[in-house]
Every structure is written in C-alpha cells, then in structure tokens.
C-alpha cells in the first residue's frame, strides 16, 4: 500500500515508498497487517490486491472494473456538480462527470458486454478524443459511460468490450482542459428514453459492490463513493 500512495501522487520523493516501509518494519507496525493476512489465509481467502486492481470475477460470471488501474484509490481532482469554470473564474458551470488524475495510462471498460456507440478522434473539440460505451440493463434501461480528453483511442464504433479491456490512453486533448486527466461521465437512459446525467461516484459505488472492488475515489481526502455505499447498505438492511 505504500507504493499505492507513491503512485497516486502523495509522495514527495522517489524513495518515499521504500523509506515509509522501513519505518513501518523497524517499529513493528507491520505485525497487524500480517495478523490480518494470516487470518484471511486460514479461512481460505486471498488478500484483496487483485480485486482492487479492477477485474473481478463474480458469482454470475460477470466482471467489473474501475476506469483506471489502481491498487488502493484513485484521485479525483474535480467531482460531479456545480463548480467554478476552470477556463473562466467569473463563471459557474455544471460538471457532468468526475475528473480523475492520470499519467498517460490505459483507460478501461467497466463492465462486460459493453457496446462502443461513439468515438471522437478530433483532438480539437471541447472533450478531445473520446469514447462512449453503452451497457444494456434487464429492464431495458441503458448506462452510457464516456471517457474524454484521451491521447489515443483503441476501439471503434460497434466493438463489444469486456470489463478491464483497454479502450485507449489518457491524455490532455480537447479545447476545455488545463492539464492531463480523465473526464469520466455516466448517463442513464430509462426504458422510455428519458436521459439524465448521474454522478459517476454513484455508478462506481455500484460497480465496486457488484465486483467486490476495494477501491476509493478520493477528493480532498474524502471518499466520494462512501455516501452511496452507505445508502445501499441501509437500503439492504431495511429490506431484510
């Protein structure tokens, strides 16, 4: 997990992870981690690093993934909702997605059986190079997941994609960006055709629960998924 902190951008030096690990070991602070892992192993369970990295097999043989590969958490630089326009401080705008910190890396499909319904290869548009993947639900509703400001796109319209499959590379393309990041947007389309933008944190919370993915989406130290996960737990307890 120390390397997770370093990769996420919290480290201030190249030897951050190794130095922190030495401090933990010298003071015997790793004994609690060992106790937890030994207890899990005695129960036939595996430590959850592979789950945290996104591709997770579930009972119904459907996989789920986060849009980027992380060991413990991903950093969100701008959440869903009203915000100051990053290109004009005098204006407010509705941010219809979340901005995820990236470093020229693969962006991934979040579910199995997704259909690529849109690809934009024009870097000089507001969202730059982008991909939209649609997932059909049993009630005939649909979820559309979009990835903006990409450096490269690896799929084409009509492709079927699976969870964890690389769709392209993150980047800084587009006329409405101030630095590299992944703008991750989610739209829900009801069976009657009604559309609405939803908080991607709510969608990722659902993905995390279904796929048993132990990752956080941190913005200013707060896990954006927590309120949605707590709501689902409360709802489940009420049904029970």
Model segments located where?
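Active-site-proximal beta-strands of protease catalytic cores
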Residues: 114, 158-173
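Catalytic cores of secreted/periplasmic lytic hydrolases that degrade extracellular macromolecules
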Residues: 1-56
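Soluble non-cytosolic domains of exported or imported proteins
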Residues: 10-18, 102-105, 141, 176
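Surface-exposed, glycine-biased beta-strand/turn segments
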Residues: 43-129, 163, 176, 224
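Zn2+-dependent peptidoglycan hydrolase active-site motif and core
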Residues: 93-96, 110-157, 179-185
């Amino acid at each position: 997990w120390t390397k997770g902190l370093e990769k996420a951008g919290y480290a201030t030096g190249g030897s951050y992870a190794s130095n922190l690990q030495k401090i933990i070991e010298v003071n015997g602070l790793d004994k609690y981690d060992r106790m937890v892992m030994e207890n899990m192993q005695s129960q036939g369970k595996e430590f959850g690093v592979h789950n945290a990295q996104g591709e997770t097999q579930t009972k119904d043989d459907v996989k789920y993934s986060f849009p980027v590969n992380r060991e413990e958490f991903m950093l969100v630089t701008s959440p869903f909702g009203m915000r100051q326009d990053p290109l004009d401080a005098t204006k407010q705008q509705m941010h219809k997605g979340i901005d995820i910190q990236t470093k020229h890396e693969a962006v991934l499909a979040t579910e199995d059986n997704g259909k690529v319904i849109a690809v934009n290869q024009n870097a000089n548009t507001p969202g730059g190079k982008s991909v939209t993947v649609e997932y059909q639900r049993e009630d005939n509703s649909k979820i559309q997941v979009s990835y903006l400001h990409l450096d490269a796109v690896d799929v084409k319209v009509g492709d079927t994609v699976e969870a964890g499959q690389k769709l392209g590379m993150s980047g800084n393309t587009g006329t409405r960006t101030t630095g590299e990041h992944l703008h991750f947007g989610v739209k829900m389309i009801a069976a009657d055709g009604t559309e609405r933008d939803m908080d991607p944190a709510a969608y990722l919370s659902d993905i995390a629960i279904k796929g048993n993915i132990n990752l956080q989406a941190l913005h200013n130290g707060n896990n954006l998924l927590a309120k949605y996960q707590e709501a689902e737990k409360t709802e489940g307890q009420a049904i029970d």
